Structures are given as structure tokens and as C-alpha cells.
Amino acid sequence: MASGQDKTHIDYAYELDITVKPDSRVPVFNREFATFTGAGVPLFSLGGGPIRYALAEVLAKFHARRGYYVVETPIIASTELFKVSGHIEFYRNNMYLFDIEGHEFAVKPMNCPYHILLFLNEVAKHRSKLPLPFKVFEFGRVHRYEPSGSIYGLLRVRGFTQDDAHIIVPGGRVIDVVYDVFEEMKLVLERLFKLGVSSETFKVRLSMSDKSLIGKEFMGSKEEWEGAEEALREAASRINEKYGIDIVELEGEAAFYGPKLDFIMMVEESGVSKEWQMGTIQFDFNLPRRFRLYDVVREEFGIEEVYIIHRALLGSIERFLGVYLEHRRGRMPFTLAPIQFAVIAVKTGGEVDREIEDLASSIAKGLLDKGFRVAVKGSSKTGLSSDVRHIESTAKPAVNVFIGAKEVREKVLDVRVFDLESMKRRRLAIAYGDAADAVENLAAVAEELESPVRSLSGQAPRIPADFSFML
């Protein structure tokens, strides 16, 4: 096992049982897991499932509360869809194509063509009653080809999930919409993940086309690209004016359909400065033309200009988790932690041990019934230090609850809550009358920890599990 200083996100993901380690062996077969899953396709494990489902729930409700329509689209489509969108012409080498009964299909590399079809369907049914801007959100799975040599852990994969949304917006409102998306990104990063968004931690990269390759690698005309890039430059300037976040420009890094703002997190780790790309906001003037949105919107809404904003607040969920695990050294916010409460029964070898065990068991069951992910660990006075070191270096629960003879006698629980901002545990003394009272008081601690999440999505997700075997 790597030391704390040498650990990568792969080590942390394995310790927390978030993912299966590809090079570990499958029992009986004596072959690596990657032999069966394939390179670049992460297999999320028991600790990773709750993270993904909880994150999906928070993000879906957050977006719904902000006027997005939550959708789900198929994983495959006829290549006729991707011919219209331009993916076959400009993105074919990054796609997985296959034949079904003589017809060519593709595993979707992006969600945008499907989202545009949904808009066209709603316009056909409801015409100008449909609101503009029209916003759809999907916690959507996509697949893109990556050379085997570039695949690495969760950071570079072939199959990944995006917190993906598309906004169909009249031309005069593009800059306001782009700025609003940045504010949404800031809310999610700060309230759910405790990541400060400031001039010290973030910068904005305006990724532009290479004008010499327009028509070859980038769709559209030079004039369209220059207009779109200027609109994003103005939106980025507004972000800079309010938050002081620096803007850099990079030629040739745009998407094939339009320029984009990429948000780069800067972190200092072991004296080494690292930059990680997080979310993205992309300006698209090509797909509206290819799907004839200009004609539809002009006819139904009387609007001459319409564009599409592609945006992902976190980007690739897999990549984001990899970066976050490395940055936070395996610590997760309470809402997403695989183990939210670890109940540690510290036995003494005396008659009180039965009371200690009964109380620990009752508290764990009560927390589980309330929807929390819980683990119970039996320990002793002599083995406690070793057990705590093991727990903190592997499972890393969000909250540790210690129950020993003193806690039983004095009716006060010894609770240690991990704080992501200080990266230390803070100690709480939680008084209780009986086990049910202890459960309610611990649930109140959880509600306080989840308060920022509730401000995003209205409520905190509850995905219970008994993970005692992990300790």
C-alpha cells in the first residue's frame, strides 16, 4: 500500500471501495479485473454506487429547481442522428460504431443531438408556449475513444458520466446565460464539495478555434467563430470583474462546433502546483443551423437568432472524483461519503461491555433506518489507537462515534466530525437519554452537515447501507 504522501486517486478509490482496482485479481479466475471490464471502463464498487446515485439526485433536483427539465436519453443511436449533428464528419475517429441488421449505429459520444431532438419534439407539440431559454439536464453516460496509452485511472477513461445540460437561448441573452451557468457551477463546488472558487484557486480558459482549420476540424465560418469567441470573452470578463479570476486564451482547443470556457482548478500539493480542468461552458452556433433551429424559432417565436449553450458544471464525473480524491486525500463530503457514520464500540473486558455493544448496535440500526450509511467496529482500550489509524487510512468515515464505558456511564457520546476545510476532525460531546435519543441527536449533526446540500436541492439524498464489513 502506498504511503499517504505517495497515494494517487486510484489508491484512495480502492481504499474507500469506490472502484474496483483494474490490476487486482478476480478470485477463481486468477486474472485481472481489467481483463473482463476492458481498459478505460471503470467498475464502480459498493462504496462508489451510493456516491453516484446521491450525486445524481442532488444535481437533478438542483437543476430542476433552477428551471431545467431533467431528461434521460438512450445510450445508442442511428448514425443518421450524428450525420445531421456533424459528429460523423468531424468526430468519427472518437466514436464507437457498429452494425445492427445492416444499419449503422453509434454509442453516443455526447448528449447534445438527443437534447435537440427533445426540443424539436416539444416545439411540435406546444409551439410558442414552450419557454425560452429552454434548458434540459441529464446525468448522462457517454463513450469516447481514447488510445490505450492515454488511459489512466478515473482521469482518462473511455466511458464516463457527465452532468450535462443544454440551453437553447435567443442571441441577445447568451452572455447573461453563460454568466448564470458560472454562478451555478460556483454554488455546486462550494456548497456540495467545499471547494472555494476564487482568484487563488481558479482560472478561466477561453478555448478558441484555429482559424486555419475552419472547415476542416471546426464547423462554420471565420466570422461566426469570431463572434462567438467575442461573446464568451465578454462573459469571462464579467466573471473577472466580479471575482478577479484570471482569463487565459488558447487557440485550437475549442470543440468542433464552437468555442468554450473551461474552468481550471489550481491546487498546491506537496509543494507542486497542479492544474485540473473542471467544468465547461460551450457556445454553439453550428448545431442550431444543422438542426434548422433558426427556422423553427423564427417561425414559432419570431426570434431571428438562437444558439445552444452546452455546459457541464463538473465535467466528467469520473474525472472530477479522481481529482477530488487526490486533492482531499480520499476525504468526501458527508453527503457523498461511502461511510457516513462509523460507530466504534470500545470494550473494556468488564461487565459493561454488553451495554457498550448493545448501545453501539442500537445506534447503528437507528441511523441505518434513517437512511444513513453506517459501519460498526468492535475495538478495545488497548487496540483502539491501531484501529483508528486503520480506519482513518482506509475507509475514512465522515463521522466517528466512540462508545466506551465512560460514554455509557455519563450518557455522552464522543463524536469526531471530519471538516473538509481544515482537513481535521472536530470533537463534539453529544448528550443522550437512551439509544433512540442518541440516534436523533446524531441525525441532527447530519442535518447540520447537509444544510448546504439542502440549499442546493431542497433535501439531502438518503441511500442507506451497512458497511460494517469494510472496517
From Swiss-Prot:
Q: Could you tell me the EC number(s) of this protein?
A: 6.1.1.3
Indicate where this protein resides in the cell. Cytoplasm
Q: Which reaction does it catalyse?
A: tRNA(Thr) + L-threonine + ATP = L-threonyl-tRNA(Thr) + AMP + diphosphate + H(+)
Q: Give the Pfam families listed for this entry.
A: HGTP_anticodon, tRNA-synt_2b
Q: From the UniProt record, give one GO term of the biological process aspect.
A: threonyl-tRNA aminoacylation
Write the protein's name: Threonine--tRNA ligase catalytic subunit
Q: Which residues bind Zn(2+)?
A: 112, 166, 310
**InterPro entries hit by this protein:** aa-tRNA-synt_IIb, aa-tRNA-synth_II, aa-tRNA-synth_II/BPL/LPL, Anticodon-bd, Anticodon-bd_dom_sf, Thr-tRNA-ligase_IIa, ThrRS_core
Cofactor(s) the protein requires to work:
Zn(2+)
Gene symbol of the encoding locus? thrS-cat
Q: Cofactor comment in the record?
A: Binds 1 zinc ion per subunit.
Q: What class of enzyme is it?
A: ligase
Misc remark:
There are two ThrRS in this archaeon. The first one (APE_0809.1, this entry) is most similar to bacterial ThrRS but it lacks the N-terminal editing domain. The second one (APE_0117.1, AC Q9YFY3) is most similar to archaeal ThrRS but lacks the central catalytic domain; it probably does not aminoacylate tRNA(Thr).
Q: Does the keyword Lyase apply?
A: no
Task: Print the keywords alphabetically.
Answer: Aminoacyl-tRNA synthetase, ATP-binding, Cytoplasm, Ligase, Metal-binding, Nucleotide-binding, Protein biosynthesis, RNA-binding, tRNA-binding, Zinc
Tell me, in a sentence or two, what this protein's role is. Answer: Catalyzes the attachment of threonine to tRNA(Thr) in a two-step reaction: L-threonine is first activated by ATP to form Thr-AMP and then transferred to the acceptor end of tRNA(Thr). This protein is probably not able to deacylate mischarged L-seryl-tRNA(Thr) as it lacks the appropriate domain.
